[in-house]
């Protein structure tokens, strides 16, 4: 599917794709709880994406782009949540010894990233990865799930010269 995304990136242009990545939280550290912050990853600057090769690899999620599992999870949550991004958080509040909420952390920031119709199309596509595609091991016995598989090159090789790859899956139920 990389060739599809390379062509899509070329058609949409670097600025639109980069702006969407920013809106999804890529390149920005996530405040998870007081004193606990997730890594920001790396979002290539706009000037670098003027290079067609850089834009091509960025379009399918490689090159200078690095993201964290938390950022990918937040992106998938945005799709599952009808296009509304919700800043991830690990702590809802502080409780006393009796379990009574005594202090609440700030409310999660939310923002609309794309409209509900776009989210429905994306959910359907991601559901097909689980129902009939390579992600079928994630298919639940009841309900609907969706997901995205990925393979990231590391640029590292084992003693036999085989490239070491990172394989991942992110999804929703």
Show where each model-derived region lies.
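Beta-lactam-recognizing serine transpeptidase/beta-lactamase-like catalytic domain environment
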Residues: 1-173
């Amino acid at each position: 599917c990389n060739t599809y995304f390379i062509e899509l990136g070329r058609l949409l242009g670097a600025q639109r794709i980069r702006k969407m990545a920013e809106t999804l939280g890529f390149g920005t550290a996530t405040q998870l709880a007081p004193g606990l912050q997730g890594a920001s990853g790396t979002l290539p600057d706009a000037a670098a994406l003027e290079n067609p090769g850089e834009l091509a690899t960025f379009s399918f999620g490689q090159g200078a782009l690095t993201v964290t599992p938390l950022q990918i999870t937040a992106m998938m949550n945005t799709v599952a949540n009808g296009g509304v991004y919700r800043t991830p958080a690990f702590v809802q509040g502080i409780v006393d010894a009796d379990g009574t909420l005594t202090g609440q952390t700030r409310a999660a920031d939310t923002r609309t990233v794309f409209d509900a119709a776009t989210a429905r199309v994306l959910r359907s596509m991601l559901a097909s990865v689980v129902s009939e595609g390579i992600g079928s091991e994630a298919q639940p016995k009841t309900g609907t799930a969706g997901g995205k598989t990925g393979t990231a090159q590391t640029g590292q090789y084992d003693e036999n010269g085989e490239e070491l790859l990172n394989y991942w899956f992110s999804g929703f139920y």
